[in-house]
Swiss-Prot record:
GO BP terms: pilus assembly
MF GO annotations: fimbrial usher porin activity
Domain of life of the native organism: Bacteria
Family per record: Belongs to the fimbrial export usher family.
Protein name (Swiss-Prot/TrEMBL): Uncharacterized outer membrane usher protein YhcD
Role, per record: Involved in the export and assembly of a fimbrial subunit across the outer membrane.
GO cellular component terms attached to this protein's record: cell outer membrane
Native source species: Escherichia coli (strain K12)
Signal peptide coordinates: 1-21
Gene: yhcD
KW Transport (keyword) present: yes
Positions of disulphide bridges: 769-792
Amino acid sequence: MLKKTLLAYTIGFAFSPPANADGIEIAAVDFDRETLKSLGVDPNISHYFSRSARFLPGEYSLIVSVNGEKKGNIATRFDENGDICLDQAFLQQAGLKIPSEEKNGCYDYILSYPGTTITPLPNQEALDIIVSPQAIIPIGLDLTNAATGGTAALLNYSLMSSRAEFSNGSSDYSQAALEGGININDWMLRSHQFLTQTNGTFSNQNSSTYLQRTFTDLKTLMRAGEVNLNNSVLEGASIYGIEIAPDNALQTSGSGVQVTGIANTSQARVEIRQQGVLIHSILVPAGAFTIPDVPVRNGNSDLNVTVVETDGSSHNYIVPSTLFNQHVESFQGYRFAIGRVDDDYDESPWVISASSGWNLTRWSAMNGGVIVAENYQAASIRSSLVPLPDLTVSSQISTSQDTKDSLQGQKYRLDANYNLPFSLGLTTSLTRSDRHYRELSEAIDDDYTDPTKSTYALGLNWSNSILGGFNISGYKTYSYDGDNDSSNLNINWNKAFKHATVSVNWQHQLSASENNEDDGDLFYVNISIPFGRSNTATLYTRHDDHKTHYGTGVMGVVSDEMSYYVNAERDHDERETSLNGSISSNLHYTQVSLAAGASGSDSRTYNGTMSGGIAVHDQGVTFSPWTINDTFAIAKMDNNIAGVRITSQAGPVWTDFRGNAVIPSIQPWRTSGVEIDTASLPKNVDIGNGTKMIKQGRGAVGKVGFSAITQRRALLNITLSDGKKLPRGVAIEDSEGNYLTTSVDDGVVFLNNIKPDMVLDIKDEQQSCRIHLTFPEDAPKDVFYETATGECQ
């Protein structure tokens, strides 16, 4: 980027007040010319900064912070007076609401949101903005300006192949999980296939194909094809038909917890803590404020709010948890499906399903649903209640009628979750079914004979900073014939020490179908010891199926794109040792993992995996190391630069020889950042704006363009005609009188955008002279700057 801000650095450090929020012009400052000269600044450019620290006219890529939260680099324009232009593109990337008045130019944000302060920081290439929290776009609220449309095809793949060799033979197995599809104008067609090959025998399992579209105005997602009965309270089945349900990405997200207060000074800092941990910090303007959707750690601990004023004073207050934790959420929105049950069942009747949910009050909710098919009907209703701040209770009753077999029954369920004092939590669940109650999938299964009579489940957890965390959970099921009764008990303890983490797990199972014989306890002890940059050593012992094993392993990373794992284990009873190792690598355009193992003297295993995605779009074919989701984008470097690393929410991706890269996953209708890793750029290339904020609707195929600037820079050693070095702080112009830069030290000039033939004019209060420079026609790509010498004559 053109470093036009270099002149402002010295003045900016000493003089950088914020832009006046009330529109009152700060009085002009008269700089002492001798003082400027002593600071190494040409007095002739002082008029640029006579009123406040500001940027020279033009466009800059600045680090923008809104209420203390960095929004990344945003292209920012300043007019001939150094005033900022808050246009629509800037406000969108900064996450600020756009004033209601229609306008294509610059918005008067101070008029729209009084109290706004804007502080340019030329010496840091940054811009600080303080606004009322009401001016910030909440997550999930603003659906405007989301990109829609676009066309691209995709193929996601996950391939695996393994071979096992034994003393008496061998076995081969391969599988391919494939997802193919195409996005056209927000419509999505997807087909899933799961192919396997076992010792030469091929099969195709679990295939499905469907068409999908989200209707934004209705906040509804529609799927047609092989879909599921997505009923919120009843079990469904796979059908050939149509499913309509709320699009979760269009539902308002956030905690729903808000904090209000009053700040006495502009740019006051509000700190919110829960359980002694800082969970949110934001700058607010003077006056009353409301902070929505505070990211609370839990709904049961009070919030401690501290307002730190600009003058250093502070005041704090408590927001009791009882004001915000007495609420429950239901599965809101209507869900509807109609179609024919697929061919995986004994019967394939036509079926209709409908369900919905309602929040009755902040502390009560209800869900209900029905399923109607040929010879089958079912209905259910579920209620949820928060009678106490730390107690949640829900109950459900379902009824079904199988007219073909003349069966009618009910099913009852009760759940409770109680957060007790001293970090103790309790969960319990009870389910009981009549002998003749049937879910849809059970009613159309001719072989279904033994329903479960009842299930009891209990969970208890407790944590302590000294003793660690404990978790106990178990369940017991009873069947009507008594042959399929079973029970399960799990106990877990874990504790993090200074140099290691220890965990102990025990599982006990008992099955009545095996005459109440012990199915074999599972016992596992693991010690993890981190070392180095990102490596972990483990020591463990496990007891299962009446056998004891001891082992040790090491896992870690070789580089940002490569990891490894090695393991050795000893079977105490069989007196055999097994060795295993694997290495995984992100090859920028796919991911590969290789593993091998040996057990005893006659057993060997080998396997390899490969996964990633392929996008076919109007710019060509682009490979991704990650799975490509419903909503994605194609990033493009305009100079076809390969190997540039781009960070996104889904992980890093790299440009190919065309300069393209797939941004594989974008959260629909949410603003997300895509950023160039400038360290991966060639040394002679700059990015005008290395961070782009994007927002797309579901199914959209977006385009993200990055303008690469091929920079020729030069470090010049300049002497005057008398042989002395050019003084520090002298302004340098081109032959047409345009300012270029300032000498940064005696005889030293750093110049951007050099040309093969250049003429530089140097003027100060004592003399003026001219320099003629000549550089090679072709710029070297492997150096940050070229060097040259010149004499000013």
